[in-house]
């Protein structure tokens, strides 16, 4: 993304949420 660190952080959190979700469910 071309949007800065904040955008990257949001994407990272989304990926982490997906990984956690798939781990427990």
Swiss-Prot record:
Q: In which tissues is it expressed?
A: Expressed by the venom gland.
The yes or no answer to whether the keyword Thylakoid is present is: no
- Give Gene Ontology CC terms: extracellular region
The main location is secreted
Spell out the subcellular localization from the entry: Secreted
Q: Which UniProt keywords apply?
A: Hydrolase, Protease, Secreted, Serine protease, Toxin
Question: Which EC numbers characterise this protein's activity in its record?
Answer: 3.4.21.-
Tell me, what is an example of a GO biological process annotation in this record?
Answer: proteolysis
Q: Tell me the ranges covered by the Peptidase S1 domain, including all copies.
A: 1-25
Q: Name one GO molecular function term.
A: toxin activity
Q: What activity regulation does UniProt give?
A: Inhibited by aprotinin and PMSF, but not by EDTA.
Q: Does the keyword Protease apply?
A: yes
The record's note on quaternary structure and interaction partners says: Monomer.
**What family does this belong to?**
Belongs to the peptidase S1 family. Snake venom subfamily.
Give the free-text miscellaneous remark of the entry.
Negative results: does not have plasmin or fibrinolytic activity.
Its function, per the record, reads: Cleaves a kininogen analog to release bradykinin.
Its protein name is Kallikrein-like EII
